[in-house]
């Protein structure tokens, strides 16, 4: 299998950072990737990550790294506001791309990256993880097998980064959304520390209804009280429902919990499969099983499986011409749902059709806030913004209360 040379920009400030987790996963996929270089403006983080993962080629200047190393793939793991700048730069250097979620701050910004990739003949995968989790892949199989009968509706509670939740629902339903009704309000709240470390006393509440092509309705809520559930979703059909990681069938009112099996790989206990109906002799359906395609690498934790799946998707697209498993189309749609919900809320809660046909007022405010904070437009002033210090807390937070 062809090995691709991958460079990572943004190595995380801490050993437990998400970027370091990705580096650890990449190192396990030795037949797919070799880490040729890492890049970060924080010298301390750069040296720590270089030592931790034994990467000799370390850069603080991104373009210098691209010119010297000429990586096949660039993985952009900088803060959200900086992703478009580094992604556009890498694409213009004819590097294949993986970027962190979401698609982009606005649909137009993401479309600019997609266009740059097309113009330079490179692939772009977006690192949406939720639908790749083993439990979620099993849910997708359960619905495809028809155990729930005709799907009628879904319920979603998601506290931050709701494009993740929309992604989970869409992938289980395997259907396209057609229209959205949204409600949103900024609320006073007891003082708390935000993701960026600042004291905040406001929080956004959101509620929405999403209609899908197959006559399924999704009811969505995000609020400070959703901590009661955490991030939780349910899929209901005429024959039963999925709630969290349980299947309930109306016939006999039988509940089936997801069952995990493990193998010993290199002395480690590694997830081999997750399924339903294997150990229940009374079940009236054949067992349904998801098997871990990465167990030979010792990859076991749910989010590590997701990371490996994302990396594998791009590798296959580059080396074999296979379609990306997620890609721009899905990433755009998940972000578009959130933007459409806020458009509906801003227009006194009217139904809005999908796809959107022009930039929304929210997207225009996001672009204006970006220019105000960083001094330029990321699409037209890309080179000038490469040396900017991008904040951990995105303009999505200051404008919309989104993470």
Briefly describe each language-model feature range.
Residues 55-62:
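Conserved SAM-binding strand-loop segment of SAM-dependent methyltransferases
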Residues 94, 121, 215, 348-349:
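Glycine-centered short loops/turns at secondary-structure junctions
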Residues 134-153:
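Rossmann-like NAD(P)H-binding beta-loop-alpha module
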Residues 199, 239-325, 361-403:
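C-terminal glycine/acidic-rich active-site capping loop/insertion
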Residues 49-55, 113-117:
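Short, conserved SAM-binding/catalytic segment
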Residues 66-68, 73, 79-80, 84-131, ...:
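Beta-strand-loop-alpha-helix segment that lines the small-molecule cofactor/substrate pocket
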Residues 1-53:
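N-terminal Rossmann-like dinucleotide-binding module
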Residues 151-236, 246-250, 329:
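Rossmann-like dinucleotide-binding domain that binds NAD(P)(H)
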């Amino acid at each position: 299998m062809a090995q691709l040379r991958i460079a990572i920009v943004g190595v995380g400030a801490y050993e437990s950072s998400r970027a370091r987790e990705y580096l650890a996963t990449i190192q396990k996929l030795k037949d797919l990737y070799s880490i040729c270089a890492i890049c970060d403006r924080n010298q301390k983080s750069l040296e720590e990550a270089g030592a931790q993962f034994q990467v000799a080629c370390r850069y603080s200047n991104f373009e210098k790294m691209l010119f010297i190393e000429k990586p096949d793939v660039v993985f952009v793991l900088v803060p959200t506001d900086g992703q478009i700048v580094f992604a556009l730069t890498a694409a213009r250097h004819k590097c294949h791309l993986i970027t962190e979620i979401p698609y982009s701050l606005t649909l137009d910004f993401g479309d600019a990256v997609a266009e740059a990739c097309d113009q330079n003949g490179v692939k772009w995968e977006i690192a949406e993880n939720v639908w790749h989790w083993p439990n979620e892949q099993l849910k997708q199989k359960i619905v495809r097998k028809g155990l729930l009968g005709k799907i009628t509706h879904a319920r979603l509670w998601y506290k931050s980064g709701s494009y993740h939740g929309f992604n989970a629902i869409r992938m289980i339903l395997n259907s396209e959304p057609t229209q959205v009704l949204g409600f949103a309000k900024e609320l006073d709240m007891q003082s708390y520390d935000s993701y960026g470390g600042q004291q905040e006393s406001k929080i956004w509440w959101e509620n929405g209804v999403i209609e899908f092509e197959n006559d399924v309705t999704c009811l969505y809520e995000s609020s400070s009280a959703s901590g009661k559930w955490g991030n939780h979703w349910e899929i209901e059909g005429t024959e039963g429902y999925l709630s969290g990681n349980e299947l309930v069938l109306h016939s006999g009112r039988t509940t089936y919990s997801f069952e995990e099996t493990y193998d010993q790989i290199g002395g480690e206990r590694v997830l081999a499969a997750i399924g339903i109906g294997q150990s229940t002799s009374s079940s009236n359906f054949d067992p349904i099983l998801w098997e871990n395609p990465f167990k030979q690498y010792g990859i076991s934790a749910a989010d590590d499986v997701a990371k490996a799946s994302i990396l594998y998707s791009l590798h296959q697209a580059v080396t074999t011409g296979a379609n990306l498993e997620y890609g721009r189309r899905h990433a755009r749609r998940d972000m578009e749902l959130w933007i459409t919900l806020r458009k509906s809320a801003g227009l006194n809660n009217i139904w809005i059709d999908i796809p959107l046909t022009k930039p929304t007022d929210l997207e225009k405010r996001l672009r204006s806030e970006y220019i105000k904070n960083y001094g330029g437009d990321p699409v037209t002033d890309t080179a000038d913004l490469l040396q900017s210090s991008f904040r951990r807390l995105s303009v999505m937070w200051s404008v919309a209360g989104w993470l």
